[in-house]
From Swiss-Prot:
The modification Phosphoserine is found at residues 167-168. This is Vesicle-associated membrane protein 7. Belongs to the synaptobrevin family. The gene is Vamp7. It comes from Mus musculus. The chain crosses the membrane at residues 189-209. The modification N-acetylalanine is found at residue 2.
Amino acid sequence: MAILFAVVARGTTILAKHAWCGGNFLEVTEQILAKIPSENNKLTYSHGNYLFHYICQDRIVYLCITDDDFERSRAFSFLNEVKKRFQTTYGSRAQTALPYAMNSEFSSVLAAQLKHHSENKSLDKVMETQAQVDELKGIMVRNIDLVAQRGERLELLIDKTENLVDSSVTFKTTSRNLARAMCMKNIKLTIIIIIVSIVFIYIIVSLLCGGFTWPNCVKK
């Protein structure tokens, strides 16, 4: 479960975006943004196996796409944090900014927050106060049909293999560290076995030779 895509836009004008993996996010997002009214509101659209959560405030839309089993409370917690950071950084400049004007700077913020809210499951317990629960109850979920320019039904296509490069690097690093740890553990175990064996042999020989100085076995 993860936040797959995030975007900040003014109407249909995209100001900043970030994708966790490959997909036709922009094609789908353009249709979603066109359906969002300009007044302040919050809503979740449902389409297939995906959810589109957004907050619209002062004509600026903060939107993210998640799997349908991703907690909505975490999605809106992410959007609220993105909104706060975006407003603090840009303020009224967003009302007249050109397309992608903030992308070079703010896409890294989206990436960091996307990763944080996707991975930190403790947010549910820490941040989901009763007020947030009540607020979430007031945010509706609506089904939405998307149509491509050719008139065909538009589906969100996700290619998570694009994110497997980072995952494979992490896996290799983890495997290497695990192998190193297992090797050290085996070395320590071997040393302990050798020491115990030597002590055991010494005790047996001492018993057979009449004592720890081996008086019956050592010639004077």
